[in-house]
Amino acid sequence: HMYNKFNMHAPSNMFVLEYASRPELADIFYEDVLKAAFYYGYPLLVENNKYGIVRYFEKRGYDNYLLGRPEHLSTPNSKVNVKTKGIPSNSNDVIQAHAQAIEAYIHDHVGVIDEEGGCGNMHFNKTLEDWIGFKISNRTKYDLTISSGLALLGAQKVKIEETKSNFNEKKFFRKYPVKSFHS
């Protein structure tokens, strides 16, 4: 999936591409995904449990189209020796964040939106059907749910609170008494 996050110049908060095919060869899938990422200019968050797509992008020189693990999903252990881009799909934190991202998206952008009195958009019926049948305990056959959730996780920006510094101008600049000299 490809997802438009907030943008003043384009439709926002909506999926713009659904890839619902299972080609016979993994390289065909990887090439299709690479072409879509290049065409749309979107970086992708991929599962890094299987290194094939990451290696394919690196081999072709397009590894800048792969996102690293989002900061808000990092743990102290995940920051150590992370060389592979993407995100592990077997981490409980990631599984929960993935499900919550889809749940929040459905609540905020699909169907009737109570606060605004309007109706949200989801143009891909196969993804809607996949979401309806999704079981968090058995995720293997829900490719569209997994890819749409990864797109949402990749688009999330978590606001990092600024820490107030203890900067004190009086301590920083030393003041000397002014003495006048008369000749």
For each predicted feature, which ranges?
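Short alpha-helix plus adjacent loop in nuclease-associated cores
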Residues: 66-112
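RNase H-like, metal-dependent nuclease domains and their acidic two-metal-ion catalytic environment used
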Residues: 1-69, 108-183
